[in-house]
Curated annotation (Swiss-Prot):
The organism's taxonomic lineage, starting at the top: Bacteria, Bacillati, Bacillota, Bacilli, Lactobacillales
Gene Ontology molecular function: metallopeptidase activity; tripeptide aminopeptidase activity; zinc ion binding
Source organism (scientific name): Lactococcus lactis subsp. cremoris
Full protein name: Peptidase T
Compartments, as annotated in UniProt: Cytoplasm
NCBIfam families found in the cross-reference section: peptidase-T, PRK05469.1, PRK13381.1
């Protein structure tokens, strides 16, 4: 194996349950995330990172790989998140499959679940590689503990394995709660103190992403008028029926299951209530600012029209922006995309530059003034029992980080 400790690190990290909690009001959202951040801080110190500190204000643990050159090199930041998605993460039992043939069905532990190339054709890309997958009872946690392990392996390489590799100052940060959308809300750009950064939080080999959705959340409240159904004619206003009518007024094909690429959507997450009152929760997504604003306006227009027809304000939308397409920031200076693209090409990795149908911590951090695109970390089928990662892709992620650092140093004066 090219990086001897990469896989052991990854296996160690995924066995720690760091599932974030969207119902929590604390930062980080769980005590397990606090404890894991402190553990990572100790590991960072053991590798030789300097100025390692935990920020109580935002749950990030930060450390520095000091420069070993006198050149005026731009400072690079590398970020990954410690939490995992909303799927069982207790008792993660990673399985290792060496020299996968690209065709066989992979049994997930003792469960009835399998990774079948017929269902997951991406498996065919991994012939001859070593795969780490689940036992079918949990997620794997490659999102984003692959990124964490890769960054730690990079730090080990620069500080201990090849300390003569010339580089400028590199800052490392591991944070909480990316999966519940609040991880970067309190990120401290001034404390991180770099010129540009990358999140190592992407998927398959070659992903290089600087365009995300713009995102908003909407809660629609419906006020009904409940009376006995036996005498309800011309009197009852059923809040649940209002919710159904509202949803049906949205564009039929603008839903996640019917969209792809650059197409945006409305996504109904939750609907509950009674004839007296009901509540619908949506997310709104689009890549283009104009269309994003049109979607939010449409949700208000539907409510206004229904209220006018009802003669009362029974439909109340509450819409709140969540994050914005970071391309608006990154495109002002594409040099950090160019250097990452060049690094991959130098390593015979074909860059995959496509819009993310989602967001990253970098979306928010970029709008705080620190451009932060996203690099591949290797995971596939993330957020569930079918998740897997290739060890060889993880190694190439470390290679890519090293090449970015080398190229960044090369252009310095």
């Amino acid at each position: 194996m090219k990086y001897e400790k990469l896989l052991p690190r990854f296996l160690e990290y995924v066995k720690v349950n760091t599932r974030s909690d969207e119902n929590s009001t604390t930062t980080p959202s769980t005590q397990a995330l606090v404890e894991f951040a402190h553990k990572m801080g100790e590991d960072m110190k053991a590798l030789g990172l300097k100025d390692v500190h935990y920020l109580e204000s935002n749950g990030y643990v930060i450390g520095t790989i000091p420069a070993n050159t006198d050149k005026k090199v731009r400072k690079i930041g590398l970020l990954a998140h410690l939490d995992t998605a909303d799927f069982n993460a207790e008792g993660v039992n990673p399985q290792i499959l060496e020299n996968y043939d690209g065709e066989s069905v992979i049994q997930l532990g003792d469960t009835e679940f399998t990774l079948d190339p017929k269902d997951f054709p991406n498996l065919k890309n991994y012939k001859g590689q070593t795969l780490v997958h689940t036992d079918g009872t949990t997620l794997l946690g490659s999102d984003d503990k692959s990124g964490v392990a890769e960054i730690m392996t990079l730090a080990d390489y620069l500080l201990n394995i090849n300390p003569d590799f010339e580089h400028g100052e590199i800052r490392v940060g591991f944070g909480p709660d990316e999966e519940i959308g609040v991880g970067a809300d309190k990120f401290d750009v001034a404390d991180f103190d770099v010129d540009f950064a990358y999140t190592v939080d992407g998927g398959p080999l070659g992903e290089l992403q600087y365009e995300t959705f713009s995102a908003a959340g909407a809660v629609i409240e419906f006020q009904g008028k409940n009376v006995h159904p036996g005498t309800a004619k011309n009197m009852m206003v059923n809040a649940l029926q209002l919710a159904i009518d509202y949803h049906n007024a949205l564009p039929e094909f603008d839903r996640p299951e019917k969209t792809e690429g650059r197409e945006g959507f409305f996504h109904l997450l939750k609907l509950d209530g009674t004839p007296e009152e009901a509540r619908a929760q949506y997310i709104i997504r689009d890549h283009e600012e104009g269309k994003f604003n049109e979607r939010k306006a449409l949700m208000q227009e539907i409510a206004d029209k229904m209220n006018a027809e009802l003669g009362q304000n029974r439909v109340k939308p509450l819409i709140k922006d969540q994050y914005y397409n970071m391309a608006q920031i990154i495109e002002k200076d594409m040099s950090i995309i160019d250097i990452a693209k060049k690094a991959m090409e130098n390593l015979d990795i074909a860059p995959i530059i496509e819009p993310i149908r989602g967001g990253t911590d970098g979306s928010k951090i970029s709008f705080m003034g620190l451009p932060t695109p996203n690099l591949f970390a290797g995971g596939e089928n993330m957020h569930g029992r079918f998740e897997f990662v290739s060890v060889q892709t993880m190694e190439k992620a470390v290679d890519t980080l090293l090449e970015i650092i080398r190229l960044n140093n090369e252009v310095a004066k």
